[in-house]
Amino acid sequence: MLRYSLKRLLSLAISLIIASLVIFLVIEVAPGDPASFMLGINAQEDTLNALREELGLNQSKLERYLSWTFGMLQGDFGTSYTYRTPVADMVQDRLWVSLPLAIYALALSTLIAFPAGIYAASRRGGLGDVSIMGATQLGVAIPNFWFAMMLVLVFAINLRWFSAGGFPGWDNGLFTGLKALTLPAIALALPQAAILARVMRSSLLDILNEDFIRTARAKGLTPRQALWRHALRN
């Protein structure tokens, strides 16, 4: 077990190093000079050189990569070229909205997917199964941004049940904050719910074909009883 864990950790470390190299190289080959972008095209050359020195852009690529990597390990993600503020501070500020949104979307997708997958598996080949599988196929095929636009159009612009944009902040109350996150959470949850529902249905159908389910049915259990008492536990 220890050997397996060490191999997995080594594999993870190698993957992270490769990913960091790819990200760094993509940024390096991108056109443009960060100093010129931050100061504008009319900036004086001595001002540009001073900013390049401050940002470490005059260092070699290897030095910049090592500085960037060790900085990330210490929680220093550098300075945003656009906002000229520490990236860690920007991430922290937005995390108070992004993390609850992700949890909200995960909860919604689970609440939608599990009942849909269970119902589809219990009605295999029936109208309910076909309808749910058709809906999940649409959910997988249609991108999130289209769902988001339709939700805003219907529920924010036409019905005016929700705000069309912006986040009021948690200072205005938990209900107000969650209400503002509802439409984005639904837009994120629907495609994930479609995938989870299909996985749930497929897993249940595999279990329903197992020998212990046949044994339970032979003992007199109805298909629904076998599903709820045995299949869902596994």
Describe every region a protein language model picked out.
Residues G40, A50-E53, S67-G71, D89-D93, ...:
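Short amphipathic alpha-helical coupling elements at transmembrane boundaries
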